[in-house]
């Protein structure tokens, strides 16, 4: 089974609109067709970002976010990150590379191409949601 890491912006996009990120989240992750990799640091970022007031303008955002976060807690494989990595200029995003290193995830999907300027880190390919969906997502 593929191991996948979702950057926070992919989850936000999935909750806001029907799009490729929502297909990844609802059709692959939450149905356990891929293994979602998490660390406490990444989960904390998910919680902080998804609880921002600016998202309250989207219908049922908070409710959908709570459901998704609860489900992720149930199904994710949690990893203890034990290595500090300093590769990305936005240092707050390095936690995703730290998770990639310890989990040996196959893919990290992000919409943040400004900060994620690398396409691979150790064993993990770094892809936009579209690249992942079109080329690597498991198909039934």
Please report, for each region that a protein language model flagged, where it lies by residue.
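PIN-domain endoribonuclease scaffold, especially VapC-family toxins
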Residues: 28-83
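Short, well-structured N-terminal submotif of metal-dependent ribonuclease cores
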Residues: 1-38
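Acidic, PIN/NYN-like endoribonuclease modules and their adjacent C-terminal/linker elements
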Residues: 101-106, 113-140
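Active-site neighborhoods of divalent-metal-dependent phosphate/nucleic-acid chemistry enzymes
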Residues: 74-109
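Short, flexible helix/strand-to-coil boundary loops that buttress conserved ligand/catalytic motifs
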Residues: 15-16, 50, 120, 137
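A secondary-structure boundary/capping signal
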Residues: 7-8, 38-39, 112, 128-129
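Residues at secondary-structure transition points
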Residues: 20, 37, 59, 63, ...
């Amino acid at each position: 089974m593929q191991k996948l890491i979702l950057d926070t912006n992919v989850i936000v996009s999935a909750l806001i609109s029907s799009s490729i990120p929502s297909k990844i989240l609802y059709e692959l992750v939450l149905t356990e067709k891929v293994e979602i990799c998490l660390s406490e640091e990444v989960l904390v970022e998910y919680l902080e970002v998804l609880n921002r007031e600016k998202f309250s303008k989207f219908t049922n955002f908070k409710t959908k976010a709570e459901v998704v976060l609860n489900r992720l807690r149930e199904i994710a494989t949690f990893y203890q990150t034990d290595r500090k990595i300093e590769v990305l200029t936005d240092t707050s995003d390095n936690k995703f590379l730290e998770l990639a290193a310890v989990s040996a995830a196959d893919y990290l999907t992000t919409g943040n191409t400004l900060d994620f300027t690398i396409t691979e880190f150790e064993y993990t390919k770094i892809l936009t949601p579209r690249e992942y969906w079109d080329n690597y997502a498991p198909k039934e």
